[in-house]
Amino acid sequence: MSFGKNLQFLRHLKGNMTQEDLAEKMNVSRQTISKWELDTAQPDMDKAIELCRLFNCSLDNLFRDDMVACSEAYTNLRV
């Protein structure tokens, strides 16, 4: 899983937050969020830490984990 897919997943998990909503919270353009989600750019360390605080996750979760698969596995365990 890529950083971009994880970011998109977290954004939707947080009440279907739009790219525009996230851009406003992060003080960047919507185009920047789009580039992050498409994996054509990555945030600098300060912005990455800010994303982690916003979504209550670790840098490791944000950049390395497959958050979608982890979420699905957790959901399947609860069923």
Regions found by a protein language model. Give the residues of each.
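A short, Lys/Arg-rich alpha-helix, primarily the initiator
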Residues: 1-14
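Alpha-helical residues within helix-turn-helix
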Residues: 9, 20-21, 50
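Residue-level detection of the helix-turn-helix DNA-binding "recognition helix"
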Residues: 12, 27, 38-40, 64-67
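Alpha-helical residues within the helix-turn-helix
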Residues: 12-13, 24, 53
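Short alpha-helical DNA-recognition segment
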Residues: 16-35
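DNA major-groove recognition helix of helix-turn-helix/homeodomain DNA-binding modules
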Residues: 46-61
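Short, charged recognition helix plus adjacent turn
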Residues: 65-79
